């Protein structure tokens, strides 16, 4: 009986050790890590320096960019685009000078320039090492990485991020969308 208890105890210890090593080899879940970084950035927003820029040519009715910096690093950029039939806000989040997350919210107006929001759509984009690793579409479902538009959206978002970071760091009070 004692031998059985010892064998079971040893086996459980070996299995627990193997499971811990397997989890350590995989590393932490990148989505969970990004969510924690996102929350930490938003908690610290009041302490960050803000840089405001006017956005020209990105939307019909203009726009505004606000960059939040911690020391020399940009940790968040909020770009708001105004249009006749709605308003869109893109929030870009950065860790170690790398894009990690974009939250896009589009508020649709019931009538032109009314300001009365009748519908809102949201998209969430998760990045790791300059690659889009997850996209949660406006229906709340994950968009497949093999979907035809996935690579195009990734390229467009990375280009926008670079343009906004470069614009926020420039001395120019405006950022222009040059086709």
Language model: regions and residue ranges:
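Sec/Tat signal peptide C-region and signal peptidase I cleavage site
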Residues: 18-22
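An exposed acidic His-Trp-rich patch
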Residues: 100-139
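C-terminal partner/receptor-binding element of secreted or periplasmic proteins
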Residues: 129-179
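Bacterial N-terminal signal peptides
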Residues: 6-15
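Mid-length scaffold segments of soluble, non-membrane domains
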Residues: 74-76, 81-103
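Aromatic-rich beta-strand edge motifs centered on tyrosine
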Residues: 67-69, 91-96, 123-129
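Short, surface-exposed coil-to-beta transition loops
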Residues: 61-64, 85-90, 117-122
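N-terminal secretory signal peptides
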Residues: 23-84
């Amino acid at each position: 009986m004692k031998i059985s208890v010892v064998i079971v105890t040893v086996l459980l210890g070996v299995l627990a050790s193997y499971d811990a090593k397997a989890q350590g080899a995989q590393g932490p879940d990148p989505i969970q890590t990004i969510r924690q970084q996102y929350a930490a950035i938003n908690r610290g927003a009041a302490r960050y320096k803000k840089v405001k820029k006017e956005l020209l040519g990105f939307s019909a009715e203009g726009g505004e960019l606000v960059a939040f910096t911690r020391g020399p690093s940009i940790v968040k950029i909020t770009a708001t685009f105004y249009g006749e039939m709605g308003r869109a806000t893109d929030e870009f989040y950065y860790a170690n000078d790398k894009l990690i997350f974009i939250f896009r919210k589009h508020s649709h107006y019931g009538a032109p320039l009314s300001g009365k929001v009748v519908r809102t759509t949201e998209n969430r984009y998760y990045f790791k090492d300059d690659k889009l690793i997850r996209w949660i579409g406006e229906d709340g479902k994950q968009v497949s990485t093999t979907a035809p538009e996935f690579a195009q959206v990734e390229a467009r978002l990375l280009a926008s991020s670079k343009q906004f970071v470069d614009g926020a760091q420039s001395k120019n009070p405006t950022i222009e969308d040059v086709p």
